[in-house]
Protein backbone atom coordinates (compact mmCIF):
# COMPACT_ATOMS: atom_id res chain seq x y z
CA UNK A 1 0.00 0.00 0.00
CA UNK A 2 1.43 3.36 -1.00
CA UNK A 3 1.81 6.12 1.62
CA UNK A 4 -0.66 8.28 -0.33
CA UNK A 5 -3.34 5.57 -0.18
CA UNK A 6 -2.71 5.10 3.54
CA UNK A 7 -3.32 8.80 4.12
CA UNK A 8 -6.69 8.76 2.32
CA UNK A 9 -8.15 5.51 3.56
CA UNK A 10 -6.40 4.22 6.63
CA UNK A 11 -4.86 6.94 8.75
CA UNK A 12 -7.23 7.97 11.55
CA UNK A 13 -9.77 5.23 10.78
CA UNK A 14 -10.76 3.00 13.68
CA UNK A 15 -13.24 0.23 12.94
CA UNK A 16 -16.07 -0.50 15.33
CA UNK A 17 -19.25 0.97 16.75
CA UNK A 18 -19.47 4.25 18.66
CA UNK A 19 -22.31 6.25 20.16
CA UNK A 20 -24.18 8.44 17.69
CA UNK A 21 -24.13 11.35 20.12
CA UNK A 22 -20.36 11.63 19.85
CA UNK A 23 -20.78 12.77 16.23
CA UNK A 24 -24.39 13.84 15.67
CA UNK A 25 -25.45 15.54 18.93
CA UNK A 26 -24.20 19.12 18.67
CA UNK A 27 -25.96 21.38 21.21
CA UNK A 28 -23.67 24.31 20.36
CA UNK A 29 -24.61 24.31 16.67
CA UNK A 30 -26.11 27.55 15.35
CA UNK A 31 -28.62 26.79 12.62
CA UNK A 32 -28.18 28.38 9.20
CA UNK A 33 -30.83 30.15 7.16
CA UNK A 34 -30.37 27.49 4.48
CA UNK A 35 -30.82 24.46 6.79
CA UNK A 36 -33.95 22.34 6.65
CA UNK A 37 -35.04 22.04 10.28
CA UNK A 38 -37.09 19.17 11.66
CA UNK A 39 -38.88 18.68 14.98
CA UNK A 40 -39.25 15.00 15.90
CA UNK A 41 -41.25 13.58 18.80
CA UNK A 42 -38.83 10.92 20.03
CA UNK A 43 -39.74 8.02 22.33
CA UNK A 44 -36.50 6.12 23.11
CA UNK A 45 -36.40 2.49 24.12
CA UNK A 46 -35.87 1.98 27.88
CA UNK A 47 -32.24 2.65 28.76
CA UNK A 48 -31.48 4.74 25.67
CA UNK A 49 -30.55 8.33 26.66
CA UNK A 50 -32.52 11.10 24.98
CA UNK A 51 -29.37 12.61 23.47
CA UNK A 52 -28.41 9.28 21.92
CA UNK A 53 -31.90 8.80 20.50
CA UNK A 54 -31.94 12.29 19.00
CA UNK A 55 -28.48 11.84 17.56
CA UNK A 56 -29.52 8.48 16.10
CA UNK A 57 -32.39 10.18 14.28
CA UNK A 58 -30.02 12.81 12.87
CA UNK A 59 -27.51 10.18 11.82
CA UNK A 60 -29.85 7.64 10.25
CA UNK A 61 -31.75 10.33 8.33
CA UNK A 62 -28.55 11.83 6.90
CA UNK A 63 -25.03 10.41 6.59
CA UNK A 64 -24.81 7.85 9.39
CA UNK A 65 -24.91 4.08 9.55
CA UNK A 66 -24.63 1.58 12.38
CA UNK A 67 -20.84 1.30 12.35
CA UNK A 68 -17.83 3.44 11.51
CA UNK A 69 -16.88 3.12 7.84
CA UNK A 70 -13.54 3.99 6.25
CA UNK A 71 -15.20 5.90 3.39
CA UNK A 72 -16.12 8.64 5.88
CA UNK A 73 -12.55 9.75 5.30
CA UNK A 74 -13.27 10.47 1.63
CA UNK A 75 -15.75 13.26 2.32
CA UNK A 76 -16.48 16.02 4.82
CA UNK A 77 -18.91 14.66 7.41
CA UNK A 78 -19.10 18.04 9.10
CA UNK A 79 -20.46 19.52 5.89
CA UNK A 80 -23.08 16.88 5.13
CA UNK A 81 -24.23 15.35 8.42
CA UNK A 82 -27.54 16.07 10.10
CA UNK A 83 -27.20 17.52 13.58
CA UNK A 84 -29.44 17.09 16.60
CA UNK A 85 -28.95 20.56 18.06
CA UNK A 86 -31.58 20.63 20.82
CA UNK A 87 -33.68 18.21 22.87
CA UNK A 88 -36.51 19.06 25.24
CA UNK A 89 -38.84 16.87 27.29
CA UNK A 90 -42.52 16.82 26.31
CA UNK A 91 -44.52 18.22 29.22
CA UNK A 92 -46.99 15.71 30.62
CA UNK A 93 -45.60 12.74 28.70
CA UNK A 94 -43.28 10.13 30.15
CA UNK A 95 -40.11 9.39 28.17
CA UNK A 96 -41.05 11.59 25.21
CA UNK A 97 -38.83 14.31 23.82
CA UNK A 98 -38.82 16.83 21.00
CA UNK A 99 -35.55 16.45 19.12
CA UNK A 100 -34.58 19.26 16.76
CA UNK A 101 -32.47 18.26 13.77
CA UNK A 102 -30.78 20.51 11.21
CA UNK A 103 -30.03 19.17 7.73
CA UNK A 104 -27.62 20.88 5.31
CA UNK A 105 -29.33 21.92 2.09
CA UNK A 106 -26.84 19.96 -0.03
CA UNK A 107 -28.43 16.69 1.14
CA UNK A 108 -31.55 17.29 -0.96
CA UNK A 109 -32.36 17.29 -4.66
CA UNK A 110 -33.89 20.52 -5.86
CA UNK A 111 -37.64 20.46 -6.52
CA UNK A 112 -38.17 16.92 -5.19
CA UNK A 113 -40.51 16.27 -2.27
CA UNK A 114 -39.88 12.59 -2.95
CA UNK A 115 -36.17 12.94 -2.22
CA UNK A 116 -36.77 15.16 0.82
CA UNK A 117 -39.03 12.59 2.47
CA UNK A 118 -36.86 9.66 1.44
CA UNK A 119 -34.01 11.28 3.35
CA UNK A 120 -35.80 12.62 6.42
CA UNK A 121 -38.38 9.88 7.08
CA UNK A 122 -37.41 7.11 4.70
CA UNK A 123 -35.53 4.72 6.98
CA UNK A 124 -35.20 6.00 10.52
CA UNK A 125 -38.74 5.16 11.68
CA UNK A 126 -37.92 1.47 12.00
CA UNK A 127 -34.79 2.09 14.08
CA UNK A 128 -34.54 -0.30 17.05
CA UNK A 129 -33.25 2.31 19.50
CA UNK A 130 -36.60 4.10 19.20
CA UNK A 131 -39.90 2.87 20.60
CA UNK A 132 -41.74 5.47 18.49
CA UNK A 133 -40.96 8.49 16.33
CA UNK A 134 -43.14 11.25 14.90
CA UNK A 135 -42.16 14.09 12.60
CA UNK A 136 -44.06 17.08 14.03
CA UNK A 137 -42.89 19.90 11.77
CA UNK A 138 -40.38 21.01 9.14
CA UNK A 139 -38.88 24.43 8.43
CA UNK A 140 -38.40 24.73 4.67
CA UNK A 141 -35.88 27.50 3.92
CA UNK A 142 -36.53 29.87 1.01
CA UNK A 143 -33.37 28.58 -0.64
CA UNK A 144 -35.12 25.21 -1.00
CA UNK A 145 -38.77 26.23 -1.43
CA UNK A 146 -37.82 28.44 -4.39
CA UNK A 147 -36.74 25.32 -6.29
CA UNK A 148 -40.42 24.23 -6.38
CA UNK A 149 -43.20 25.50 -8.64
CA UNK A 150 -45.75 25.05 -5.87
CA UNK A 151 -49.52 25.21 -6.51
CA UNK A 152 -50.46 25.40 -10.20
CA UNK A 153 -52.36 28.68 -9.71
CA UNK A 154 -53.10 29.64 -6.11
CA UNK A 155 -55.99 31.33 -4.34
CA UNK A 156 -56.14 34.70 -6.10
CA UNK A 157 -55.80 33.26 -9.61
CA UNK A 158 -58.55 30.72 -8.85
CA UNK A 159 -60.92 33.44 -7.67
CA UNK A 160 -60.19 35.43 -10.83
CA UNK A 161 -60.83 32.37 -13.00
CA UNK A 162 -64.14 31.69 -11.26
CA UNK A 163 -65.10 35.37 -10.78
CA UNK A 164 -66.16 34.58 -7.20
CA UNK A 165 -65.12 36.77 -4.28
CA UNK A 166 -65.99 37.56 -0.69
CA UNK A 167 -67.19 34.14 0.47
CA UNK A 168 -66.09 30.54 0.84
CA UNK A 169 -66.65 28.31 -2.18
CA UNK A 170 -69.24 25.53 -1.93
CA UNK A 171 -68.72 21.94 -3.01
CA UNK A 172 -70.31 18.51 -2.83
CA UNK A 173 -69.00 14.97 -3.13
CA UNK A 174 -71.31 12.87 -5.30
CA UNK A 175 -72.87 9.97 -3.39
CA UNK A 176 -73.04 7.03 -3.46
CA UNK A 177 -69.35 7.26 -4.15
CA UNK A 178 -69.32 3.96 -6.06
CA UNK A 179 -71.89 2.15 -8.18
CA UNK A 180 -73.58 4.86 -10.26
CA UNK A 181 -73.50 4.71 -14.06
CA UNK A 182 -71.77 7.60 -15.81
CA UNK A 183 -75.05 9.13 -17.01
CA UNK A 184 -76.71 9.00 -13.59
CA UNK A 185 -73.53 10.36 -12.06
CA UNK A 186 -73.60 13.30 -14.48
CA UNK A 187 -77.25 13.92 -13.64
CA UNK A 188 -76.39 14.16 -9.93
CA UNK A 189 -73.59 16.62 -10.77
CA UNK A 190 -75.95 18.81 -12.82
CA UNK A 191 -78.61 18.97 -10.10
CA UNK A 192 -76.08 20.01 -7.44
CA UNK A 193 -74.50 22.69 -9.63
CA UNK A 194 -77.77 24.23 -10.82
CA UNK A 195 -78.92 24.40 -7.20
CA UNK A 196 -76.13 26.84 -6.35
CA UNK A 197 -72.91 24.95 -5.63
CA UNK A 198 -69.63 26.05 -7.18
CA UNK A 199 -68.13 22.57 -7.44
CA UNK A 200 -69.00 18.92 -7.31
CA UNK A 201 -66.44 16.21 -6.73
CA UNK A 202 -65.42 12.67 -7.56
CA UNK A 203 -64.76 10.76 -4.37
CA UNK A 204 -61.20 9.63 -3.79
CA UNK A 205 -61.74 6.04 -4.93
CA UNK A 206 -63.64 6.95 -8.11
CA UNK A 207 -61.06 6.21 -10.79
CA UNK A 208 -62.07 3.96 -13.70
CA UNK A 209 -64.05 0.94 -12.50
CA UNK A 210 -66.18 -1.49 -14.53
CA UNK A 211 -69.46 0.24 -13.59
CA UNK A 212 -68.17 3.68 -14.70
CA UNK A 213 -65.11 4.16 -16.90
CA UNK A 214 -63.28 7.45 -16.54
CA UNK A 215 -63.84 8.71 -20.08
CA UNK A 216 -67.63 8.23 -19.86
CA UNK A 217 -67.71 9.99 -16.50
CA UNK A 218 -65.67 12.93 -17.78
CA UNK A 219 -68.00 13.42 -20.78
CA UNK A 220 -71.24 13.34 -18.77
CA UNK A 221 -69.79 15.60 -16.07
CA UNK A 222 -68.66 18.12 -18.70
CA UNK A 223 -72.18 18.14 -20.13
CA UNK A 224 -73.56 18.75 -16.64
CA UNK A 225 -71.15 21.65 -16.06
CA UNK A 226 -72.06 23.42 -19.31
CA UNK A 227 -75.79 22.97 -18.76
CA UNK A 228 -75.62 24.29 -15.17
CA UNK A 229 -73.49 27.25 -16.26
CA UNK A 230 -75.98 28.17 -18.97
CA UNK A 231 -78.87 28.09 -16.50
CA UNK A 232 -77.23 29.91 -13.59
CA UNK A 233 -74.84 32.34 -15.27
CA UNK A 234 -72.10 31.22 -12.85
CA UNK A 235 -68.85 29.40 -13.58
CA UNK A 236 -69.07 25.81 -12.34
CA UNK A 237 -66.65 22.91 -12.00
CA UNK A 238 -66.40 19.23 -11.15
CA UNK A 239 -63.25 17.69 -9.67
CA UNK A 240 -62.47 15.05 -12.30
CA UNK A 241 -60.27 12.50 -10.55
CA UNK A 242 -57.29 11.86 -12.81
CA UNK A 243 -55.59 9.48 -10.35
CA UNK A 244 -54.49 6.34 -12.19
CA UNK A 245 -52.20 3.34 -12.00
CA UNK A 246 -49.41 5.02 -13.99
CA UNK A 247 -48.25 8.61 -14.43
CA UNK A 248 -48.78 8.29 -18.18
CA UNK A 249 -52.42 7.29 -17.72
CA UNK A 250 -52.93 10.08 -15.18
CA UNK A 251 -51.66 12.72 -17.61
CA UNK A 252 -53.80 11.22 -20.41
CA UNK A 253 -56.88 11.75 -18.25
CA UNK A 254 -55.85 15.33 -17.45
CA UNK A 255 -55.33 16.02 -21.16
CA UNK A 256 -58.85 14.76 -21.93
CA UNK A 257 -60.30 16.94 -19.15
CA UNK A 258 -58.58 19.97 -20.67
CA UNK A 259 -59.90 19.08 -24.13
CA UNK A 260 -63.44 18.97 -22.70
CA UNK A 261 -62.93 22.47 -21.30
CA UNK A 262 -63.12 21.34 -17.67
CA UNK A 263 -61.71 23.93 -15.23
CA UNK A 264 -60.33 21.53 -12.62
CA UNK A 265 -58.97 18.01 -12.11
CA UNK A 266 -58.25 16.04 -8.97
CA UNK A 267 -55.51 13.81 -7.58
CA UNK A 268 -55.11 11.52 -4.55
CA UNK A 269 -51.64 12.77 -3.70
CA UNK A 270 -50.58 10.29 -1.02
CA UNK A 271 -51.76 7.10 -2.71
CA UNK A 272 -50.67 8.48 -6.10
CA UNK A 273 -47.29 9.60 -4.79
CA UNK A 274 -45.40 12.89 -4.74
CA UNK A 275 -43.61 12.34 -8.04
CA UNK A 276 -46.93 11.81 -9.82
CA UNK A 277 -48.48 14.76 -8.01
CA UNK A 278 -45.69 17.16 -8.95
CA UNK A 279 -45.87 16.01 -12.57
CA UNK A 280 -49.62 16.66 -12.64
CA UNK A 281 -49.21 20.06 -10.96
CA UNK A 282 -46.74 21.12 -13.64
CA UNK A 283 -49.15 19.99 -16.36
CA UNK A 284 -52.01 21.89 -14.71
CA UNK A 285 -50.10 25.16 -14.57
CA UNK A 286 -48.96 24.83 -18.17
CA UNK A 287 -52.52 24.13 -19.35
CA UNK A 288 -54.70 26.33 -17.16
CA UNK A 289 -56.27 23.58 -15.04
CA UNK A 290 -56.93 23.98 -11.33
CA UNK A 291 -55.84 21.01 -9.19
CA UNK A 292 -57.90 19.65 -6.29
CA UNK A 293 -56.02 17.37 -3.89
CA UNK A 294 -57.54 14.62 -1.78
CA UNK A 295 -55.52 13.32 1.18
CA UNK A 296 -56.73 9.70 1.11
CA UNK A 297 -54.48 7.54 3.34
CA UNK A 298 -53.33 10.47 5.49
CA UNK A 299 -54.66 9.00 8.76
CA UNK A 300 -52.47 5.92 8.26
CA UNK A 301 -49.54 8.32 8.57
CA UNK A 302 -50.72 11.09 10.89
CA UNK A 303 -53.35 9.79 13.34
CA UNK A 304 -51.08 8.27 16.00
CA UNK A 305 -49.91 10.94 18.44
CA UNK A 306 -46.47 9.46 19.04
CA UNK A 307 -45.55 7.82 15.73
CA UNK A 308 -45.73 8.79 12.08
CA UNK A 309 -45.98 12.31 10.76
CA UNK A 310 -48.26 15.23 11.61
CA UNK A 311 -50.53 16.43 8.82
CA UNK A 312 -48.95 19.90 8.94
CA UNK A 313 -45.84 18.31 7.41
CA UNK A 314 -47.91 16.65 4.68
CA UNK A 315 -49.64 19.99 4.09
CA UNK A 316 -46.32 21.80 3.65
CA UNK A 317 -45.15 19.07 1.31
CA UNK A 318 -48.31 19.42 -0.76
CA UNK A 319 -47.85 23.17 -1.09
CA UNK A 320 -44.38 22.50 -2.45
CA UNK A 321 -45.42 19.62 -4.70
CA UNK A 322 -48.44 21.48 -6.02
CA UNK A 323 -52.20 21.68 -5.46
CA UNK A 324 -54.81 24.43 -5.43
CA UNK A 325 -57.15 22.75 -2.89
CA UNK A 326 -56.49 20.17 -0.19
CA UNK A 327 -58.77 18.50 2.33
CA UNK A 328 -57.94 19.80 5.79
CA UNK A 329 -60.55 18.42 8.20
CA UNK A 330 -63.58 20.27 9.55
CA UNK A 331 -63.16 20.65 13.34
CA UNK A 332 -66.96 20.18 13.57
CA UNK A 333 -67.83 17.15 11.39
CA UNK A 334 -67.32 13.39 11.43
CA UNK A 335 -63.53 13.39 10.91
CA UNK A 336 -60.95 14.10 13.57
CA UNK A 337 -59.52 17.62 13.81
CA UNK A 338 -58.58 19.83 16.78
CA UNK A 339 -59.41 23.48 16.20
CA UNK A 340 -56.13 25.26 17.01
CA UNK A 341 -53.96 22.59 15.40
CA UNK A 342 -56.17 22.59 12.31
CA UNK A 343 -56.01 26.37 11.99
CA UNK A 344 -52.24 26.14 12.37
CA UNK A 345 -51.78 24.06 9.24
CA UNK A 346 -54.57 25.94 7.44
CA UNK A 347 -52.45 29.08 7.86
CA UNK A 348 -49.41 27.16 6.62
CA UNK A 349 -51.39 26.35 3.47
CA UNK A 350 -52.77 29.83 2.79
CA UNK A 351 -50.46 32.47 4.23
CA UNK A 352 -47.14 33.77 2.97
CA UNK A 353 -45.41 34.13 6.35
CA UNK A 354 -46.33 32.15 9.47
CA UNK A 355 -44.79 32.85 12.87
CA UNK A 356 -43.72 30.09 15.24
CA UNK A 357 -46.61 29.30 17.61
CA UNK A 358 -46.33 26.16 19.71
CA UNK A 359 -49.93 26.53 20.95
CA UNK A 360 -51.01 25.77 17.36
CA UNK A 361 -48.33 23.16 16.77
CA UNK A 362 -46.13 25.41 14.64
CA UNK A 363 -42.56 24.68 15.71
CA UNK A 364 -40.79 26.97 13.24
CA UNK A 365 -41.40 30.30 11.55
CA UNK A 366 -42.13 29.54 7.88
CA UNK A 367 -41.51 32.02 5.06
CA UNK A 368 -42.99 30.86 1.74
CA UNK A 369 -41.52 33.86 -0.14
CA UNK A 370 -44.62 34.44 -2.28
CA UNK A 371 -45.31 30.81 -3.20
CA UNK A 372 -49.04 30.64 -4.15
CA UNK A 373 -51.40 29.53 -1.40
CA UNK A 374 -53.69 26.49 -1.20
CA UNK A 375 -57.41 26.60 -0.38
CA UNK A 376 -58.24 24.32 2.58
CA UNK A 377 -61.27 22.11 2.00
CA UNK A 378 -63.59 21.36 4.93
CA UNK A 379 -65.31 18.06 4.21
CA UNK A 380 -66.73 15.16 6.17
CA UNK A 381 -70.04 14.91 8.02
CA UNK A 382 -71.03 18.57 7.75
CA UNK A 383 -74.50 20.04 7.15
CA UNK A 384 -76.35 23.37 7.23
CA UNK A 385 -76.27 23.72 11.02
CA UNK A 386 -72.46 23.69 10.81
CA UNK A 387 -72.37 26.57 8.32
CA UNK A 388 -71.90 29.42 10.85
CA UNK A 389 -69.04 27.63 12.61
CA UNK A 390 -67.35 26.69 9.32
CA UNK A 391 -67.64 30.24 8.00
CA UNK A 392 -66.18 31.61 11.22
CA UNK A 393 -63.39 29.04 11.53
CA UNK A 394 -62.17 28.86 7.93
CA UNK A 395 -63.01 32.34 6.62
CA UNK A 396 -63.51 33.26 2.98
CA UNK A 397 -60.48 31.50 1.49
CA UNK A 398 -61.78 27.96 1.83
CA UNK A 399 -64.00 25.37 0.19
CA UNK A 400 -66.89 24.02 2.28
CA UNK A 401 -67.83 20.63 0.91
CA UNK A 402 -71.12 18.94 1.79
CA UNK A 403 -71.62 15.43 0.39
CA UNK A 404 -74.38 13.77 2.38
CA UNK A 405 -75.26 17.27 3.58
CA UNK A 406 -76.38 18.08 0.02
CA UNK A 407 -77.47 14.80 -1.53
CA UNK A 408 -79.17 13.64 1.67
CA UNK A 409 -81.73 16.45 1.44
CA UNK A 410 -85.26 14.97 1.53
CA UNK A 411 -86.27 16.82 -1.65
CA UNK A 412 -83.23 15.89 -3.73
CA UNK A 413 -79.87 17.22 -4.86
CA UNK A 414 -80.87 20.63 -6.21
CA UNK A 415 -82.88 21.63 -3.11
CA UNK A 416 -79.96 20.35 -1.00
CA UNK A 417 -77.63 22.66 -2.90
CA UNK A 418 -80.08 25.56 -2.52
CA UNK A 419 -80.19 24.98 1.24
CA UNK A 420 -76.41 25.12 1.53
CA UNK A 421 -76.10 28.20 -0.67
CA UNK A 422 -78.80 30.07 1.27
CA UNK A 423 -77.19 29.11 4.59
CA UNK A 424 -73.77 30.29 3.38
CA UNK A 425 -75.05 33.59 1.98
CA UNK A 426 -76.94 34.22 5.24
CA UNK A 427 -73.82 33.58 7.33
CA UNK A 428 -71.61 35.78 5.14
CA UNK A 429 -74.15 38.62 5.23
CA UNK A 430 -74.54 38.32 9.01
CA UNK A 431 -70.78 38.35 9.49
CA UNK A 432 -70.41 41.40 7.25
CA UNK A 433 -73.08 43.16 9.32
CA UNK A 434 -71.01 42.54 12.44
CA UNK A 435 -72.98 39.68 13.97
CA UNK A 436 -71.20 37.01 16.02
CA UNK A 437 -71.40 33.72 14.09
CA UNK A 438 -70.14 31.66 17.02
CA UNK A 439 -72.85 32.97 19.37
CA UNK A 440 -75.73 33.72 16.99
CA UNK A 441 -75.15 31.00 14.37
CA UNK A 442 -78.27 28.92 15.04
CA UNK A 443 -80.45 32.03 15.10
CA UNK A 444 -79.00 33.18 11.76
CA UNK A 445 -79.82 29.82 10.16
CA UNK A 446 -83.36 29.84 11.60
CA UNK A 447 -83.98 33.35 10.26
CA UNK A 448 -82.87 32.29 6.77
CA UNK A 449 -84.96 29.12 6.91
CA UNK A 450 -88.09 31.21 7.49
CA UNK A 451 -88.02 32.34 3.85
CA UNK A 452 -86.22 29.33 2.30
CA UNK A 453 -88.29 26.13 2.40
CA UNK A 454 -85.27 24.15 1.11
CA UNK A 455 -83.18 25.30 4.08
CA UNK A 456 -86.07 24.71 6.49
CA UNK A 457 -86.35 21.09 5.32
CA UNK A 458 -82.58 20.58 5.69
CA UNK A 459 -82.63 22.07 9.19
CA UNK A 460 -85.37 19.67 10.22
CA UNK A 461 -83.58 16.59 8.86
CA UNK A 462 -80.23 17.30 10.53
CA UNK A 463 -81.28 19.13 13.67
CA UNK A 464 -80.16 16.32 15.99
CA UNK A 465 -77.13 14.96 14.09
CA UNK A 466 -73.89 14.90 16.10
CA UNK A 467 -70.69 12.88 15.77
CA UNK A 468 -69.61 12.20 19.35
CA UNK A 469 -67.34 9.21 19.83
Curated annotation (Swiss-Prot):
PANTHER family: RIBULOSE BISPHOSPHATE CARBOXYLASE (PTHR42704), RIBULOSE BISPHOSPHATE CARBOXYLASE LARGE CHAIN (PTHR42704:SF15). Transmembrane segments: none annotated. Its EC number is 4.1.1.39. The modification N-acetylproline is found at residue 3. It comes from Iris ensata. Its cofactor is Mg(2+). Substrate binds at residues 123, 173, 177, 295, 327, 379. RuBisCO catalyzes two reactions: the carboxylation of D-ribulose 1,5-bisphosphate, the primary event in carbon dioxide fixation, as well as the oxidative fragmentation of the pentose substrate in the photorespiration process. Both reactions occur simultaneously and in competition at the same active site. Heterohexadecamer of 8 large chains and 8 small chains; disulfide-linked. The disulfide link is formed within the large subunit homodimers. The modification N6,N6,N6-trimethyllysine is found at residue 14. The disulfide bond which can form in the large chain dimeric partners within the hexadecamer appears to be associated with oxidative stress and protein turnover. One of its GO terms (biological process) is reductive pentose-phosphate cycle. The modification N6-carboxylysine is found at residue 201. Binds 1 Mg(2+) ion per subunit. This is Ribulose bisphosphate carboxylase large chain. Mg(2+) binds at residues 201, 203-204.
Amino acid sequence: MSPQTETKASVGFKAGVKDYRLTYYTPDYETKDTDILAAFRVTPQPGVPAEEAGAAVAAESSTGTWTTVWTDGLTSLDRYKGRCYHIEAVVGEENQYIGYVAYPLDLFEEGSVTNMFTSIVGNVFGFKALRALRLEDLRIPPAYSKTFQGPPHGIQVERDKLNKYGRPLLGCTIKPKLGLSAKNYGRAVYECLRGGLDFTKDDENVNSQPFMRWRDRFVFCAEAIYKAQAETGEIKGHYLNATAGTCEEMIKRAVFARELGAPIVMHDYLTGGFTANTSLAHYCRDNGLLLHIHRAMHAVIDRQKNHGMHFRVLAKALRMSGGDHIHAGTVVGKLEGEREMTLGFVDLLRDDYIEKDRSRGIFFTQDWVSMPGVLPVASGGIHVWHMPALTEIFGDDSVLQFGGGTIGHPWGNAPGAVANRVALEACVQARNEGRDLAREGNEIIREASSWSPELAAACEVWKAIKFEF
